[in-house]
Amino acid sequence: MEDRRRPLLTGRWYLLIAAAYLAGLLSLGAGLRHNVGFPLDDSWIHQQMARNLVRYRSFGFTPGVTSSGSSSAFWTFILSINYLLFPAHSPVFFPLIVNAALIVPSGILLWRIAVFDGLPLIYALALALLPALSGNYIWLAFTGMEHVLFATLSLLAILLWFRAGGVLRRGDATGSGNALRTSLLTGLALGALGMTRPEGLALSVLLFALYRWCGRSVSDVLRAAAVAVLFLVPAFVINLKTSGTLLPMTLRGRRFLFGNTDKLHVGWSTVRELTRETYAKVIQHNFFHTASGWAMVGVVLAFYGCFVLLRRFPNRTSLLALWAMLHYASYCFMLPATGHGGRYQPFVLLLFPPLLAIGLFDLIALICRFLLPRTRALLLPAQSMALIAVAALTAATLPRWRVALRDSIYDIDNCHLKMAEYLNEHYPPGTKMGVFDIGTIGYFSHIDLIDLGGLVDRNYLPYLMSGRVPQYLEERGVNYIILAHNGPEGEYDGTGSPTRFGDELHFFRNPALRLEEIHSEGIDYPTWYSSYVYTQHAYRFQTLYRIVYLNQDTAAK
């Protein structure tokens, strides 16, 4: 067994996998030509916090003020390296280089996981190579955010935790020689994972609960947990200081954005909501590019592929499938949404194409074994044809996501950035303004920005949830707001009401105030819509209003 696996762990296989991921990166990277930027406004929130950390020695979105704003403390620290060492360089390329340097190892880790588990070669190829052809997964590397790091650290922790067997180390069949080292390294990976995103803590629970099936001892668990705590405690301290809770306040703000509530809830309604959104947006539209129900066939095959991996339990690939399921389940009650471009569900983006292929492989094997026993010689050619078909289907997503990347960057640069430039030209530094999409405007403008999305100030959330946002702004002397909204087409194209945020924040049809429109920035509908249907990155317009507060007598009249 050892001799059979060893040739699959040589440099030529790693080069093949790396070449596939580099090709995927180059394919989407063409969307950056004359169009450098981030496809999401949230990307600039991380940049603002990293810059503030270096300039003001404070962790927060508001310069010089300790506050919330990011759900990933570890990613903020990584981005701050750019401002510490290369402050004059573009903030776009540093996270792209980091994510590119992480997404290639994610494929190599998948390959090693499959090889160590003894999966058939064609299964290993599907698991390692197909994500490189997924435009949606490769797109994560261009967001400037932490999701590729999260996926790669997860794969690393799973691989390390199962290294106790030492299958390739001669003369050490029990793995006792490297058990200490790999348990410490696993703790390091798990700690960094929990500091990258709070739901990463669940992988620690899963690995430690299954330690016996992974060939580990209680001592290994204690060592790994002790190392992980070194990372998790600082993350919890930061959250307590900025949000008043162990979890970042951004989760509550995002729950309001996607569900109009900040409460945790688990039930059939949240499971149904997340499942329906995952199927309609991530699978049916973003992967298959169809509105037809035939996409459900792919979902069924992927579920069957997941079952194929789980029936091999205990091994690394089955644990990866369990972790993907646990991660998805955590979002059913923590934040029942797929996020912009499916970014909250990186394992769906990573594993859907391979699971689809593995499901096909197993069905073909069953047919050859039981229904057509005389065709066993055709098993590998048939599985190879299935792999080519799934690869072609997956690769077709690359050009679509290149267009989505290009157009969403164009929207952020020609709407949000243009608004920031307008503010710098027409208002003195320190002018107080309430803003909903805070990333780009907060990074590039010199205004005193007041967050309206519930991501920064924990004292704001009670006002947001009780419909008293105008009162919050009036108490702080804020006379301007910038609201994101769609054009009139939002009523019929399913992208959202033009007055959604104005209504939810109680600025429209409010007898206690009047809004006077000052300036608006936006882009053409076709360009905006071509990216929005894939990423839901931002509304089409950013409009600046003056708030005229009315006295009680005037409001009563």
Question: What annotation goes with each model-predicted range?
Answer:
Residues 3-557:
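Membrane-proximal envelope and lipid/glycan-remodeling enzymes
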